[in-house]
């Protein structure tokens, strides 16, 4: 049984303990009562069971991890709840919590002890609680790394993932490059993936090979309880389409926007920030190269960053210590705050704070595990001896080995059944993929040319239908002139990337800042898209974002042939072998009539010739 299903069952069983006394008003009031700051010191059976239900609920919402604060009330109905315990009582509360976590079961680790402001000698402790580690299963968080060219994106990722500082000349970034021209230019041109693993207590498990500096992904995946995947995107403007595809197709949970302290907000920085905000992806900022930046330049850069963050209606939080890390991590999923880190890849300044933030920041994804499986493909590979490999993200449901899914749509809009014979997560073979996780599947007996980015693997229960035409509600972020019908642009909808024509719209023309409901039509082939999906379309300097509101289903080639066959059977009958004559008379009767006419004509012609002779 899956870990989440086990937690749900245990939480349900504990809830049933309170169901027996629903008729008693006093017990009902006690059930609705929250937990005060000292409930762990009492550890009554009722409070313990209530706390276990609370922790299990938080673990399910956080996909296996959550943050709790000892010495703070939980769901208290009091208007002025008291927080904080003495250090002696806090130690007792921590011991009591460890015993409770063994019953759940879960593993807890102390993050920080905080002194309450105005509370004298009262303290609280922040703990991170995780499900017990299991083999070949871990919490996965995806972070998109964006920013202007030369902001230090690849260098920071090299330092974080390989636990080695940079030499100031870009040695750390060379560990991540994939192509020859990237080594020569020092600039990322493709979507790169790098991982950072944490064990159940928050310790980093990345151990690069001392000879070739490569990471053993399989070993990291088996040792870690949480795995952070960095999606390294290009910063140069000419690679903007690759960056947009990485933001829409790889489904990041967070965005790390990099800004060079010596350069400030230049180039594509604002564009990348607006892209993340339009896709509703939480953003935190990392200011790099503070070791080589003069104090006055750094101060001016921070003023501009604060002004930019506030213009996006977010509260900037400059992270200076571990208390700021906890405060930023707890409030980050609400999308109302924007943490800002100042780091140096050469001296290592504030890098431990950034690592701890990545360790404890919670996930708040909308899980649809009970829905039918829907897997979007964002990359295709060919492996000798294995065949075609499709990688992507599971948006809903679960996929297990030997499941039969539908792959499509093809250029005709068809979907073909495909058995799942092999599943890998981070290069590690697994037996199941859950909603929100990325994975790779081996597609047997299918050529690589028949699979493309943007295709999906869906449950046959969905009965998927491809579409050429769809409607969307859009917002034009920038356009130099006006947009009219028949305008063409490149659309990014999830992993779908195709040019489409603007067929119709509500207004006569669209300008920068306008909103409207429009209709698009793909120019090449049908795609499988769902209402509610975020989209981005661009063409030159034109940028717009929107949401798919409805789709117009298109009949596949197989459906069209079936309809034509049914139509012929209804028109001519099931036993008809050919087309019906235009006058509607049966073929046999016409032939008999022609034969009779020919005999009469021959007889009359013969009699005429006899009389004439």
Swiss-Prot record:
Summarize where GTP binds, as residue positions. 147-154, 232-236, 288-291
Q: Which family does it belong to?
A: Belongs to the TRAFAC class translation factor GTPase superfamily. Classic translation factor GTPase family. GTPBP1 subfamily.
Give the span(s) annotated as G5: 344-346
What one GO molecular function would you report for this record?
GTPase activity
Residue numbers spanned by region G4: 288-291
Residue ranges, annotated region (G1): 147-154
The cross-references to InterPro entries, in alphabetical order and at most eight, read: EF-Tu_GTPase, EFTu-like_2, GTPBP1-like, P-loop_NTPase, T_Tr_GTP-bd_dom, Transl_B-barrel_sf, Transl_elong_EF1A/Init_IF2_C
* One Pfam assignment: GTP_EFTU_D2
Q: What is this protein called?
A: GTP-binding protein cgp-1
- Ranges for the region named G2 are 186-190
> Where are its TM segments located?
none
Which residue ranges does the record assign to the tr-type G domain? Answer: 138-367
Coiled coil stretches, renumbered: none
What's the name of its gene? cgp-1
Q: Name one GO biological process term.
A: translational elongation
CDD domains, per the entry: GTPBP1_like, GTPBP_II, GTPBP_III
Specify where the region named Disordered lies, as residue ranges.
554-589
Region (G3), start-end ranges: 232-235
Which keywords does this Swiss-Prot/TrEMBL entry list?
GTP-binding, Nucleotide-binding
Q: Per its UniProt record, what SUPFAM superfamilies does this chain match?
A: EF-Tu/eEF-1alpha/eIF2-gamma C-terminal domain, P-loop containing nucleoside triphosphate hydrolases, Translation proteins
């Amino acid at each position: 049984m899956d870990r989440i299903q086990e937690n749900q069952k245990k939480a349900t069983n504990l809830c049933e303990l309170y169901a027996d006394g629903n008729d008693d008003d006093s017990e009902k009031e006690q059930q609705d009562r929250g937990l005060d700051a000292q409930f762990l010191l009492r550890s009554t059976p009722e409070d313990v069971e209530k706390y276990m239900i609370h922790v299990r609920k938080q673990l399910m919402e956080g996909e296996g991890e959550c943050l709790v604060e000892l010495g703070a009330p939980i769901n208290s109905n009091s208007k002025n709840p008291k927080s904080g315990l003495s250090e002696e009582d806090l130690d007792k509360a921590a011991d009591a919590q460890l015993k409770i976590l063994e019953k759940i079961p879960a593993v807890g680790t102390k993050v920080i002890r905080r002194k309450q402001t105005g509370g004298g000698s009262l303290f609280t402790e922040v703990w991170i609680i995780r499900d017990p580690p299991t083999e070949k299963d871990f919490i996965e968080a995806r972070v998109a790394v964006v920013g202007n060219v030369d902001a230090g994106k690849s260098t920071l990722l090299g330092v974080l993932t390989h636990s080695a500082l940079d030499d100031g000349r870009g040695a750390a970034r060379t560990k991540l490059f994939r192509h020859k021209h990237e080594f020569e230019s020092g600039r990322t041109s493709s979507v790169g993936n790098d991982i950072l693993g944490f064990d159940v207590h928050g310790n980093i498990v990345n151990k690069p090979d001392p000879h070739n500096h490569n990471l053993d992904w399989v070993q990291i995946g088996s040792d870690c309880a949480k795995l952070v995947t960095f999606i390294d995107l290009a910063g140069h403007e000419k690679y903007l389409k690759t960056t947009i595809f990485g933001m829409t197709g790889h489904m990041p949970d967070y965005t790390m926007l990099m800004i060079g302290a010596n350069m400030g907000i230049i180039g594509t920085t604002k564009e990348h920030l607006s892209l993340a905000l339009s896709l509703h992806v939480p953003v935190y900022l990392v200011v790099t190269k503070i070791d080589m930046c003069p104090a006055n330049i750094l101060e001016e850069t921070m003023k501009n960053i604060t002004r930019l963050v506030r213009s996006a209606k977010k509260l900037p939080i400059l992270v200076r210590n571990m208390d700021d890390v906890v405060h930023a991590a707890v409030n980050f999923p609400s999308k109302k705050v924007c943490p800002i880190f100042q780091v140096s890849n050469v001296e290592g300044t504030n890098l431990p704070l950034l690592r701890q933030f990545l360790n404890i920041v919670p996930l708040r994804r909308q899980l649809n595990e009970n829905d039918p499986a829907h897997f979007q493909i964002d990359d295709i590979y060919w492996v000798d001896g294995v065949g075609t490999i499709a990688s992507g993200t599971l948006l809903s449901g679960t996929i297990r080995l030997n499941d039969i899914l539908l792959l499509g749509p093809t250029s005709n809009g068809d979907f073909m059944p495909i058995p799942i014979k092999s599943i890998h997560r981070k290069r590690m073979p697994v037996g199941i993929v859950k909603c929100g996780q990325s994975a790779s599947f081996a597609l047997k007996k299918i050529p690589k040319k028949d699979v493309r980015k943007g295709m999906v693997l869906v449950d046959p229960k969905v009965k998927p239908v491809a579409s050429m035409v769809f409607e969307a509600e859009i917002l034009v972020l920038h356009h130099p002139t006006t947009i009219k019908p028949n305008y063409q642009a490149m659309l990014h909808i999830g992993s779908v990337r195709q040019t489409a024509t603007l067929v119709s719209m509500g207004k006569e023309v669209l300008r920068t800042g306008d909103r409207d409901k429009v209709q698009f039509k793909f120019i090449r082939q049908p795609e499988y898209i769902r209402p509610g999906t975020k989209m981005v379309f661009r063409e030159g300097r034109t940028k717009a974002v929107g949401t798919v509101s409805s789709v117009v289903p298109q009949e596949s080639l197989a459906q069209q042939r079936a309809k034509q066959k049914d139509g012929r059977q209804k028109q001519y009958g099931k036993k008809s072998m050919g087309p019906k004559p235009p006058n509607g008379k049966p073929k046999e009767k016409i032939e008999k009539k022609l034969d009779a006419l020919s005999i009469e004509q021959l007889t009359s012609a013969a009699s005429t010739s006899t009389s004439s002779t």
